[in-house]
Amino acid sequence: MLDLVIVNVPYMFINNPPLAGAVLKSCVEEQGFNAKSMDYNIDFVNHPVATNDIVLWLQKEDSPPQAENYINFKNWVKECAKEILSQQARWIGISIFTKDSQLACEEFVVALKDLDPNCQIVLGGMGQEDRRNQWGARWIDLMWNSGIVDSVIAREAEKEVVELLKHDKKEFVQALQLTVEELDNLPVPNFDDYNLDLYGDLDPYSTEETISMPITGSKGCVRKCTFCNVASFWPKYRQRNGHNIGKEIIDLYNKYGINYFKFTDSLINGSLKDFRLMNEYITDRMPNTISYKGQFICRPARHMPDRDYDLMRSAGCKLVQIGMESGSEAVRDHMGKKFTNSDIERTTYSLADQKIRQQWFIFVGYPTETDADFEETL
């Protein structure tokens, strides 16, 4: 008998296997429990029920699908629920990655409880905290107050899911942020339950590799930009040790044979010390073998000398996504970005010299932006 089944539900992109299931599986198995990860999102996107109107509805609930397609979707969910229940797990954990998984989660929960009212369901994931516009309340509060789920873990579940299995408590847990030491001591994620051949990086800005492996080096952000909600989820920025991250990358490469890694971090160079340590660790042990991409913040030359860009290239950095946001320093200052146009120029050329591709995020229509500010961006 399994202790835990970790379920991913639609809708998510399929550029990499879900990280939550792999992380939680390794955490509970390290403590002597057994778990299985089941990705029904990858099954969905390869199934005839994934019609355009169903996908749109999952992402935008005020766009109802055709009745026949909705019935087919519900029947598919019911078959998935039967398969989940056949695992005979003590707990069924459903991971809600973004708000795009909320509607599917509701369908899965109803189907599971219809088939077995005594099954124990715990919800988790950052997507459960998004608000429902028509109710003005967090979605997870609506689910909990309805009484249809047995437990909820809000925020970081790596420790709390182990406590759930130890004590079988049916409660709403507002998890505390993990400390840096706790992040460094997490086991390497276990992707054994996923068919990795089914995943592919469909991002048009990706490198030539097709299958990517997700990895988390930090949680939170060193900035608190006015338009961003990252600080509301992770108030304190925490960074794993760079050697720890580099070792995990190499361990995953050696185990699964995938050499392309995608960071889930808000930024990969928040801690320059650990960013250097990671790049040095990979360069020293496996130069020009690994490829990775991630989100990046523009920094002045005094913070990131040329050697840092050399290390990025030798460690395998192929693409960075940068929140440049605006060509106007006045707009960026109001946002809290804290870099100059000279910093942008220097960062751009330094990355280009190392043949590291760049994808910029540009913010048009920021509240303080004037026509002159917009012209600076152009």
Model-identified regions with their sequence ranges:
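Catalytic cores of alpha/beta
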Residues: D308, T368-L378
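Acidic, low-complexity intrinsically disordered segments
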Residues: L2-G257
